[in-house]
Regions:
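Alpha-helical solenoid repeat scaffolds
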Residues: 1-184
Length: 184
């Protein structure tokens, strides 16, 4: 099989199974996820994703669709997991939120924000602000201000409850901010 294949989903899955030593299996897994169509049996998709966690935003969406058909009790857990761990293409993210947004908790949104910040993507994290619980938004704004070296960072930090600032992640962000701004 060439690095880029037009093989159907089932053929990609068969190759993954039969050629366990295939170099860069992630390439085949991504291609398998891209090959899932509306005609692909939900049970086959579900089986695939129970053995291979999704790698793409489309894969996360197809896994959730299969779960709705085959194992509805898992949809909320998988939606939470996907939201916390996946990076979605903009169109997939909107579709995900339209379909599964009501399954998400405030903790899911905080976890996603935290992950995006750890990945060093404050501009993407900024888009999460409105989804965060009101009690967390001042801290999120302060973290964004530190990450982007905003001129009013000190003022924004003063608006955050001291208890919220006393977590390992926030202390690390403060130290990094102080170092970047030459104040450490």
């Amino acid at each position: 099989v060439a690095p880029k294949t037009e093989a159907a989903f089932a053929a990609c899955v068969d190759l993954l199974r039969d050629a366990a030593d295939w170099p860069e299996p992630e390439v085949l897994r991504r291609q398998a996820e891209d090959r899932i169509t509306a005609a692909t049996p939900a049970a086959a998709v579900w089986k695939y994703f129970t053995e291979n966690p999704p790698l793409t935003s489309a894969g996360h969406m197809r896994r959730l669709e299969a779960a709705q058909a085959v194992s509805p009790k898992d949809v909320q857990r998988l939606a939470s997991e996907s939201w916390r761990t996946a990076t979605f293409k903009p169109a997939d993210e909107q579709e995900f939120l339209n379909r599964y947004g009501t399954s998400l908790t405030p903790d899911d949104n905080i976890a996603r924000f935290d992950r995006i910040m750890r990945e060093g993507r404050p501009q993407v994290a900024k888009d999460m602000l409105s989804k965060l619980p009101p009690t967390y938004q001042p801290l999120a704004s302060a973290r964004l201000a530190m990450a982007t070296r905003a001129a009013d960072t000190v003022q924004i930090l003063r608006g955050v409850a001291p208890a919220q600032l006393d977590t390992p992640a926030v202390r690390l962000e403060r130290l990094q901010w102080l170092r970047r701004t030459g104040n450490l």
